[in-house]
Amino acid sequence: KAIRRQRQMCIRDRITYFYTLIDDAVARVMKSEGGYIWACKNYDGDVMSDMVSSAFGSLAMMTSVLVTPDGKYEYEAAHGTVQRHYYKHLKGEETSTNSVATIFAWTGALRKRGELDGSHELEEFADKLEKACVKTIEDGKMTKDLALITTIPNPVVLNSEDFIKAIRSTLEGMLLL
């Protein structure tokens, strides 16, 4: 019944719609060059988005936005917590945890708050913080997960704290402009 209703809504809105099983969807996504909207139920979307982000880079680079039917938003890092890094941290061991998805979840929420409140300054801050993350990585400063897959020559692998400090330094430079 729900699938039939979704199909009817897509036809009404002139969106191409077809239903497929999860194994077929995974195969299609892995071969695809993109260019489509992929609507999934919560669990399927969670599993499949984790698979795609891991296959094409790092799960720690993906955020998630949940939108309720009545227009409420929740921004989160798609990967949840990084439990094994947390346990290493508790033992006093150094970690190289990529915090980009967590930062982007925060900036998404800040940007939305700025939009709702009409605070362009807050929206601009969120934009600059995201740009600072990207620039820091493009400048070759990154966590271990990114260093393993980058094409940037001689990346500097930073631990969690130093990576955040590097982003902060980049952001501070951008805020002065």
Where are these regions (language model features)?
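Single conserved hydrophobic/aromatic residue that forms the stacking wall/gate
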Residues: 1-7, 11
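Glycine-rich phosphate/nucleotide-binding loop
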Residues: 29-128, 135-136
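A structured beta-alpha segment of the ubiquitous adenosine-cofactor-binding alpha/beta core
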Residues: 12-35
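Sparse, context-dependent recognition of short Cys/His-centered cofactor- or disulfide-binding micro-motifs
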Residues: 14, 23-24, 50, 131, ...
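Internal helix-turn-beta structural module
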Residues: 91-97, 112-177
